[in-house]
């Protein structure tokens, strides 16, 4: 690799890291709580208040209710253990906990990238830093604190453990023992792991039996450790008559949707490496960017061409076993050529298994989030393709590197624009959190009454812990929340217009309401007597008046 290319790659790497870190923290600031996010937050805060970590994780099906004691849940305490730990570390401040969460994601990403450098070289490091660190799916995972998206970060660790196990070196025994435990932890965040990557690993070990038997004892140790990770769940289930487990079985029996209607979005394997989020379909992209900037459509199209080409080239080379270029693995830019090939073999093995298993086991095919466990491994097709271009198509390789520079700026801009309306909701939620949190701290344990629209009573119930939420009719303090109608964030009061799915036009905690838990729209602000009250706090959208009642 020449010195000029080295310098260019270092610049690309530096810019990718800077943009990734800045964007991750910037986007999380105003990330919004959706319906299932609020459910997860409520369940977490209940565990935080009682100092008891739930033995189950997130709800398998969004129920539409914030409180639902009969919801079917993911087995295992991993999700809420992590959630509560970060919340406790932040001393019960939701937005501080989100900063810790983003930091943890980035630390794991950087560990993965450092490992990439030592195993595959500078070119691989720079390319993956650009593709993964500045990636819409990664940004979504990082900013959605209350969803079980840490499977994305665990996918980085799984690739490291799996690759080190394959290297057959001094510490391969240790990594062999860690393979199943890391998947068990993933499974406590998202149960779809057991319909995809877990059976893929088992079948892979069978296919590579001659190698697997060498580490059988350590693999078995890993299975035993995985069992221990689920032991608390099993103990509670035995005590309550396998309540949650039976609900899971019944849910599976009741799920009668034809498989062709719930076919797994296995295309996520390719989409992960592209410019866009899978949930923003082509029509949305064309409608949005087609008017604003046709150039962006071209950039997005190029990202899909690169992703598809990487997939095809890798498939030909790994599955059809045809060397596109006899020197493709001969140079030092991609060291560990056998390791790269084996990782890609696992990648392609996953695809049919992730399709067949939900069909056979009557599982839900699910969306792209069901394949987060393979997020990190999805990018190894890009590495092989980049190596192919470097040797076979040097001019295209130069264009590829130029596109990387465009990519890292365009992706962050694209994510910002696509999520602009949602960020307005998130900002309103953050200001709502700020105002009720300030009231709870100001009351300092004294009973109080809140005069406002009912949405704030709901926010206080959701966000304040037991010590802070001392709302009572027998109160010593009264608070009035006023809304700044001149603020650019203020549009309409909460009414049926929110059902038009224009969330930026209404102050809501999430951008759609379920009739089951929609707060009333009653406004008690007019009942507050401003005499002898003082303005104690304001933010961009709200203000708080306080009045202490005479004893």
Each model region followed by its residue ranges:
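Transmembrane-helix motifs of polytopic, lipid-linked glycan transferases
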Residues: 14, 99-124, 157, 309-314
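Transmembrane alpha-helical segments
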Residues: 19-24, 385-390, 400-426
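Transmembrane-lumen/periplasm boundary regions of multi-pass, lipid-linked membrane glycan transferases
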Residues: 40-46, 197-306
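Loop-to-helix entry region of an early transmembrane alpha helix in multi-pass inner-membrane enzymes
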Residues: 77-84, 89-107, 141, 293-302
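Hydrophobic, aromatic-rich transmembrane alpha-helices
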Residues: 107-111, 205-206, 284-340
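Short acidic/glycine- and proline-prone juxtamembrane loop motifs at membrane-interface regions
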Residues: 137-150, 191
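Membrane-interface alpha helices of multi-pass inner-membrane proteins
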Residues: 174-191, 224-228
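Hydrophobic/aromatic-rich transmembrane helices and adjacent perimembrane loops
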Residues: 195, 338-393
